[in-house]
Regions:
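Jelly-roll (double-stranded beta-helix
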Residues: 5-8, 237
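Bacterial Sec-dependent N-terminal signal peptides
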Residues: 2-5, 18-38
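Catalytic metal-binding/acid-base residues of hydrolase active sites
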Residues: 73
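Sec-dependent signal peptide hydrophobic core
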Residues: 10-18
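Extracellular beta-rich repeat passengers
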Residues: 31-66, 77-92, 100, 104, ...
């Protein structure tokens, strides 16, 4: 090869290398940040080519709809009540957050180093980084059952003088939008009056709302709490919550299918259920429930069900709990069917594992070799799956 041809070849190679490097750099470029604060009063879309930063409370009001594209990353600045960062959907407004297994929608803390949803497994935060922001709260107009016997009430931690902070009503089919393939991480900040926020809080939400494929990772309080309402939900995964995995209260009357709760060292119960406190009790249904523990502790309970609860729980597989862990059943109106409990890998088939339930034994059945529909493969998109597979 003569000198000129050699130089042209080298130049071409360098050009190719430079072009390839440029493509790589462009692919890794951090998306621009958009700070969000205050109220959203008209239909708005958050796109995947931005990182949205919630700075204190962001609320959707006046019947507006917030649409969030698949693969969008939302971060929230740290802070406690009254400066806690959170996303609040008020009654009559909607959230349309529909991700995919390949492009989930991720809510996390601004302390999280990730700059793209695809970098989730590179986060420097872990399950001990709880309580960094306020989570997501949805206020709907479906029936609730509260102490004041009113059809509506305000969410604790919000200003009771502001009527947009109220939830509940008579609309069983109330529609607050859609949430699907959404991961909510490191929430549960202090909200005043001795309480912390949940990862996802559903207050009086109606059954036209769609809740499916939701992950709550390392929240300081409950993972997901239902305050009354009639909303149905499916494919819920809660990992290492500071309190309960799933909590039902105020006469929740919906159906939840496919639940997986992985308790951490600070967790309390896999599931806690409190009945209605007002004119009606509600009537819930839970099915295909998998509860397990990373490190067994005497303080962890499998389930707590109070005396005012009414509903059914079927096909429950609880594993790896300590010998001191029990199901606390105080209600004669809750049926527990197809329970399989193992403690320290020992199969349990005895009512002695259920406190307060002996007089209600007709509502309790044990099974073995249960097969659950909520196989862990369905959660391959989650941060939980990525972290436990390391």
């Amino acid at each position: 090869m003569d000198g000129k041809r050699f130089l042209r070849a080298v130049s071409y190679c360098l050009l190719c290398i430079g072009f390839t490097t440029s493509l790589i750099n462009c692919g890794a470029q951090e998306a621009p940040s958009v700070t969000i604060q205050g109220s959203i009063s008209e239909d708005t879309t958050w796109t995947a080519d931005n990182i949205y930063v919630l700075d204190q409370e962001t609320r959707v009001i006046n019947g507006a709809t917030l649409t969030i594209e698949p693969g969008t990353l939302i971060k929230a600045t740290p802070g406690e009540y009254p400066n806690a960062s959170m996303l609040l959907i008020t009654k009559g407004s909607k959230i349309n957050a529909v991700g995919t297994p390949e492009k989930p929608i991720v809510f996390t803390s601004s302390d999280d180093n990730i700059t793209r949803v695809e970098e989730s497994n590179q986060s420097l935060l872990n399950e001990n980084n709880k309580g960094l922001w306020g989570g997501i709260i949805i206020l709907g107009g479906a029936p609730i059952s509260t102490e004041n016997r009113d059809i509506s009430t305000f969410y604790v931690g919000l200003d009771p003088s502001d009527k947009s902070n109220y939830y509940g009503g008579n609309n069983v089919e109330d529609n607050s939008g859609v949430m699907k393939y959404v991961s909510i991480r490191y929430g549960g900040t202090y909200m005043g009056t001795g309480s912390e926020s949940n990862g996802l809080t559903l207050c009086g939400v109606g059954n036209k709302t769609q809740i499916d494929q939701i992950e709550v990772y390392a929240n300081q309080d409950d993972g997901i709490e239902f305050f009354g309402g009639t909303v149905n939900a499916s494919n819920l995964l809660v990992y290492s919550s500071g309190d309960d995995g799933i909590d039902l209260d105020e006469g929740y009357s919906g159906e939840i299918k496919n639940i997986m709760v992985v308790l951490g060292e600070q967790s309390d119960s896999g599931i806690e259920i409190s009945g209605g406190q007002g004119a009606f009790q509600g009537d819930f249904s839970l099915s295909n429930v998998q509860l397990t523990v990373q490190t067994p502790s005497e303080d962890q309970q499998i389930m707590r069900i109070d005396s005012a609860s009414k509903g059914s729980i079927s096909t429950v597989l609880a594993s790896n709990f300590s010998d001191a862990s029990k199901i606390q059943l105080q209600s004669s109106q809750v049926a527990l069917q197809q329970l399989q409990i193992s403690k320290n890998q020992t199969q349990v088939n005895s009512l002695s594992e259920i406190n307060g339930g002996k007089e209600n034994s007709k509502n309790i059945t044990f099974s073995s070799g249960l097969s659950l529909e909520n196989d862990s493969k369905g959660y391959n998109w989650t941060l939980t799956k990525q972290m436990v597979s390391r």
